[in-house]
Regions:
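A short loop-to-beta-strand scaffold at the N-terminal edge of the catalytic core in hydrolase folds
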Residues: 10-21
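Conserved HGGG/HGGXW glycine-rich cap/lid loop of the alpha/beta-hydrolase fold
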Residues: 19-71
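Active-site loop/oxyanion-hole signature of alpha/beta-hydrolase fold enzymes
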Residues: 60-101
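Conserved hydrolase catalytic core segment
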Residues: 99-137
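Short beta-strand/loop motif that positions the catalytic acidic residue
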Residues: 195, 201-203
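Acidic catalytic loop of the alpha/beta-hydrolase fold
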Residues: 206-210
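Catalytic histidine neighborhood in serine/cysteine hydrolases
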Residues: 220-236
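Catalytic active-site module of serine/aspartate enzymes centered on a nucleophile-bearing elbow/loop
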Residues: 232-258
Length: 258
């Protein structure tokens, strides 16, 4: 695993990442942004398969505190995805010498991609968001409450510790933040009208954390709309539940950007 150093608020962080080279000249780099409990390793072989399917350079990194990346000194706050999209992601892209990427974000990573796209619309080529969140639904909170019960009653802590140096904190920061009263008002829809790049939004019809309204609102509120892919027999992780369909959709989307 590779590491790169970034600086945020006068503090240095070592960030782990993987980097698969391009095999087709002229294709934009793809940067993967993981879910709220994810990291580089939890993408499994999806980055490598995506590189093979698209011919693009594909990078994936673990945000601070996830995987083997250095943790933040403070607990996660309600605006943590804003911080990742506006501050950390730009620093990572600069450190890895990535320009005009296609962001590919899953769940929290999809929300971070939208925040970046709305904050810096001239700095990316396009975005693919899979099961993103733009606002909080009761379905989301129910799923997160169920996750807490599983955490407390199964061997999930041991399993998550295989992927994260600080697994207990990863879970607590995510779960506590989403279930806190202030987070009920979390909303990033105001970023959508500023997004001008091409968008592909993917969601499973059986998503256990959200309704399809989450991607419908992207098409409604962005100036140029978005391509929507709603997958049957698919939950909150499209790249796992419907891998072939997701790889094909992203490949076609990227090829059309040329």
């Amino acid at each position: 695993m590779n590491t790169v150093s970034i600086v945020f608020q006068n503090r240095s962080y070592a960030i782990e990442y993987v980097d698969f080279p391009a095999t087709v000249a002229g294709r934009p780099p793809l940067v993967l942004l993981h879910e709220g409990l994810g990291c580089v390793a939890m993408w499994r072989d999806f980055p490598e398969k995506l590189a093979a399917a698209t011919g693009c350079r594909v990078l994936a990194y673990s945000r601070p505190g996830y995987g083997a990346s250095d943790p933040y000194p403070d607990r996660r706050q309600t605006d943590y995805m804003h911080r990742e999209g506006r501050d950390i992601l730009p620093a990572v892209l600069a450190a890895l010498d990535v320009e005009q990427p296609v962001l590919v974000g899953h769940s929290d990573g999809g929300s971070i991609a939208l925040i970046f796209a709305g904050s810096y619309p001239a700095q990316l080529r396009a975005a693919v968001v899979m099961a993103p969140h733009e606002f909080v639904e009761e379905e989301t909170l129910a799923g997160i409450r169920a996750a807490r019960e599983l955490w407390e009653s199964t061997d999930w802590p041991k399993k998550l510790a295989r992927y994260h140096k600080h697994a207990a904190r990863v879970f607590a920061d995510w779960n506590d933040c989403w279930l806190s009263p202030p987070f009920r008002h979390w909303n990033i829809e105001d970023f959508l009208p500023a997004i001008t790049c091409p968008l592909l939004a993917i969601q499973g019809r059986q998503d256990e954390y959200a309704t399809l309204r989450q991607i419908d609102v992207i098409a409604e509120k962005t100036p140029h709309g978005a391509q929507l892919l709603k997958l049957d027999q698919c939950g909150h992780t499209p790249q796992r539940d419907q891998e072939a369909a997701v790889l094909a959709a992203i490949s076609q989307f990227v090829a059309a950007l040329a």
